[in-house]
């Protein structure tokens, strides 16, 4: 057991699940979008829906979408800061069958018109699980440098991506593969030990059959490089 698991994260309260985890869900969604969102539909499920307002979950998710970290003292003011930043958001509730009680579904549109749907759960102690991206099941927590590759489900893409990582001395900690249907749309999620350089993202983005590439460097918390 890690010390973090006992003490929990440094955060603005009141709850690690409803506040710190919610900030991280919003922040990860922003990073996956690859740019500042201009509109956000925020849908709360389960415990988030029942007690989220009293625990500040709504403000925490908006704070994350603005790029704040869980210990940011501005989290309680995120609604007014969103207005200043030009972020138009709505907050509602949803019933998600089989989802964790602390789950949020975020539908985002970025300043360039790019769209993204992310489902994330706060699983305790400020930890999160990103369980869907654009309707495709995923399973990662944002605790590593993470490479997310969207591609056509055709042979060779896994080898291309892993070769590009190996050529740069980047070790893969975990790798998960998901697809909509055989020959359809696929997503790779690779958690890595080393940071993901710009050159890697650029190279992968230029490969035939690869639709979108996102690199999340967790050492920098908010750094992201994304291309479509």
Enumerate the predicted regions with their spans.
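Non-transmembrane, aqueous-exposed alpha-helical and coiled segments at domain scale
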Residues: 30-41
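Protein-protein interaction/assembly regions in multi-subunit complexes
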Residues: 25, 67-70, 75-76, 84-86, ...
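Conserved phosphate/anionic-ligand binding catalytic regions in large, soluble enzymes, centered on
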Residues: 8-26
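Short, hydrophobic/aliphatic alpha-helical segments
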Residues: 1-10, 40-43
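Contiguous domain-boundary segments centered on the initiation and propagation of an alpha-helix
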Residues: 66-116
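A structural-propensity feature for long, helix-poor, extended segments
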Residues: 41-84
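A conserved regulatory-domain signal marking ACT and ACT-like small-molecule sensing domains
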Residues: 91, 119-228
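Short glycine/threonine-rich loop-to-helix capping motif typified by GTGT followed
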Residues: 51-59, 101-103, 186-194
């Amino acid at each position: 057991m890690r010390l973090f698991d006992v003490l929990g994260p440094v955060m603005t309260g009141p709850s690690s699940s409803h506040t710190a985890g919610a900030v991280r869900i919003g922040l990860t969604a922003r990073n996956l979008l690859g740019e500042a969102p201009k509109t956000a539909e925020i849908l709360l499920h389960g415990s988030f829906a029942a007690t989220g307002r009293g625990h500040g979950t709504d403000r925490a998710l908006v704070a994350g979408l603005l790029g704040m970290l869980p210990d940011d003292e501005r989290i309680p003011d995120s609604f007014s800061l969103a207005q200043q930043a030009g972020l138009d958001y709505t907050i509602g509730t949803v019933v998600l069958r089989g989802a964790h009680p602390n789950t949020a579904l975020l539908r985002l549109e970025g300043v360039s018109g790019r769209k993204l749907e992310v489902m994330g759960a706060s699983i305790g102690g400020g930890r999160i699980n990103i369980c869907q991206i654009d309707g495709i099941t995923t399973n990662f927590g944002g605790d590593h440098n993470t490479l997310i590759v969207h591609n056509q489900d055709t042979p060779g893409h896994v080898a291309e991506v892993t070769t590009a990582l190996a050529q740069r001395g980047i070790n893969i900690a975990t790798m998960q593969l998901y697809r909509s249907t055989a020959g359809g749309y696929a997503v790779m999620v690779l958690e890595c030990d080393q940071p993901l350089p710009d050159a890697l993202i650029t190279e992968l983005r230029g490969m035939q059959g690869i639709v979108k590439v996102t690199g999340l460097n967790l050492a920098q918390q908010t750094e992201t490089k994304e291309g479509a």
